[in-house]
Amino acid sequence: LYGGQQAVALQTNDQLMTAETFDDAIVAYRSGGPVHIRDIGRAIEAPQDTTLGGWLNGKPAILLAVFRTPGANVMSTVEAIKKALPQLRASLPPGINVAIVSDRTQTIAASVADVRFTLLLTIALVIGVIAFFLRKLWATVIPAISIPISIIGTFAVMYVLGYSLDNLSLMALTIAVGFVVDDAIVMVENIVRHIEGGAAPLQAALDGAGEIGFTILSISISLIAVFIPLFLMGGVVGLLFREFAVTVAVSILVSVIVSLTLTPMLCAKLLPAAGHGKEGRVSRALEAFFTWLVHAYDRGLIVALRHRRITLGVMLATMAATGWFFVVIPKGFFPQQDTGLIVGVSEGAPDISPEGMKQRQQAILEIASRDPAVASAVGYIGPGGPTVTENDGRVFITLKPKGQRNVTADQAIARLTKAVEQVQGMRLYMQAAQDITIGSRLSKTQYQFTLVDIDQSELNFYAQKLMAKLQDLPELTAVASDQEAPGRTLAIQIDRPAAALFGITPATIDDTLYDAFGQRHIARIYTALNEYYVILEVNPQYQLGPNALQRIYVLSQNSTMVPLSQIASLSPAVTPIVVNHQGQFPSVTLSFNLAPDATIGAAVSAVQKATRDLHLPPSIATSFQGNAQAFQSSLSTTPPLILAALFAVYIILGMLYESTIHPLTILSTLPSAGLGALVTLLLIGRPLDVIGIIGIILLIGIVKKNGIMLVDVALEEQRDRGLSSEEAIHHACLLRFRPILMTTMCALFGGVPLMLGTGTGSEIRQPLGYAIVGGLLVSQVLTLFTTPVVFIYMDKIGQALSARSRAKPSRLADAMRIAK
């Protein structure tokens, strides 16, 4: 109200704040007296929805799942939440506590810490290899300097690109350690060789850098070319590994710049002249060992060159074996991780009551809590979030740290699955939470297969038949369906003429039923911190069973109460409690986990065969979803991806050498690496998954450097000294034997910590280590003998083609001759 000088605000006590005040509220007047709520019912303080329930270790709880927004850093997000918790706790009433039940960032932090240790261990191992081969302080320090410089330079580029330091980028840096020292090792070894030949350090640095610069450039550019297909790879997998590829490529690029500039300068300034310093006994012993090793290799090389056809046959057999092993090796998607979290879906009968669901869900949580590997078990029931029906619930089981339990997550799932079988009328489907998941479709188990049809009854019929077949497959376990069994329904058939006699419409009947059983929200209570719904329903004791409808009366037009039974009939029926859709059509999704020792490749093939054997009608469309669909996509793109990497390397090498022949010699080193990687994965019982494929692609870049170093020297010997192809490649093999051995050992020791890692998140890194180590071991043994033979044959082919082109006059020459 506004006066001449002042304004006054109006405020009423229109809001009832407690159940007692609602009890005193007047809703009508009858016979001249007021009718209070307490006269016809009662107001109580109670949960908003009694069909819902949540528990933590046996105590009632409200569960809150927090997800970061796209682009947000999960570690900083969780840290901000933890900082806000004390203030939140202070605002809650006594007796209510807020606790973090499951924190995925702890696993992420542990995994990052483990891979950080792996990175440091790799650096130490690589420096040890350099010291073992060069046996001189500064000759060891100079290549080692390239490691931190390359890593720091990579960090700078990652920062500009907005990348974060996570498992994939750290894994990329770990692998890159073996790459970034290669260039410096080759440069230092060549300069040291000139110094030992009598040259001054400065002159040796100039001569050595000029001599080996093109080789280093060829190695690095062709290595970066390997990652071009990864840069262009589409889909979610491509997005995941684009950062990996960029990280490795940038580190290699920085190392090239360091090796061609800083490394020669340091060699000129820090390396002593020949004869300075006295070699120790260990150094002399190592030098004698390397000399013996070179002589032994020389003897073997002479035999290989003498029996060229046999050696070439070995290489061709290696190529054939690589193709055969690629076909027969089991295929996977991503390694199964043990993140310490198990997520589960509990499913009761479609007509189970909320009270029955609560009792069984609590029994499941109690059984899970008693397991020695479990740190906490939390769950809830009722519609909300990913749960859409009252007979479904969710379970989240946090396992103890790996050091405090003697079972993996999958073993814990198997044990818990057997333990909860004692809970009658409930099924529990569990899966180990994974850091990398594709797709947003939620299912009871890990992999999904969807059927879509326009005819719901036909779809349900064939979905049930297919599910029965899938349950018999040995490759699958925990087969589930989102097709809920029909639930009990009480059909209310309104007698419209009878209702019309009383002036009652169907809408009035619907409103009456909603008032009684629908938990109608009729008001809100607002407080300083919260708001509460005022809910209307009949007394819970009058909601038990179909007989409750006998007590329902409907208000007629003349204000008389008419029994519902007088204007409607009741009949029991069954009906689906949920109908799922995909693309606006009815759908059923069958989900499954993998049986022990089964691969997703075998499971997908088994599901496809079972589907074909069922002879589904043409109207039913089928497709894999989520991880299974991404696996199919990655499986189909793997051969083109590898071929694209080979083609990119061939094009780059062809441009560098201005030849179409010699790049083939270099690429001939690759089949043995692929064979080693595939055989290693087979021997340890691992499938060829996305991580293993990345390892094979990396091997393309690593192994071809051996061929580049040999071909470079051989071509130079032919050009400068006029040697035959056999003499040139023989000399090149002996001259480059030590740097080849050094660079291979550095790359190999870069993969060993990944291969042997057992810490948190090691499951996803191990296939990369196994593929690299196995591929390098086999290729190192074979390519040192097969590459020289291939060079000789390719050189002869090149000479023959050159001679033919010289002998055949060009059309222009013919035209000029005719004109004359």
Model features per residue range: what roles?
Residues 68-72, 78-125, 157, 165, ...:
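Membrane-helix entry/capping segments
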Residues 101, 108, 112, 188, ...:
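Helix-loop junctions and hydrophobic alpha-helical segments within the transmembrane domains
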Residues 119-123, 213-214, 276, 302-316, ...:
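Membrane-interface helix starts
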Residues 124-193, 200, 232, 250, ...:
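Hydrophobic transmembrane alpha-helices and their membrane-interface caps
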Residues 159, 163, 231-240, 275, ...:
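Transmembrane helices with small-residue packing motifs
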Residues 177-191, 213-232, 239-283, 395, ...:
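Transmembrane alpha-helices and their membrane-interface boundaries in multi-pass membrane transporters
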Residues 212, 281-335, 419-422, 449, ...:
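Signature of alpha-helical transmembrane segments and their immediate interfacial
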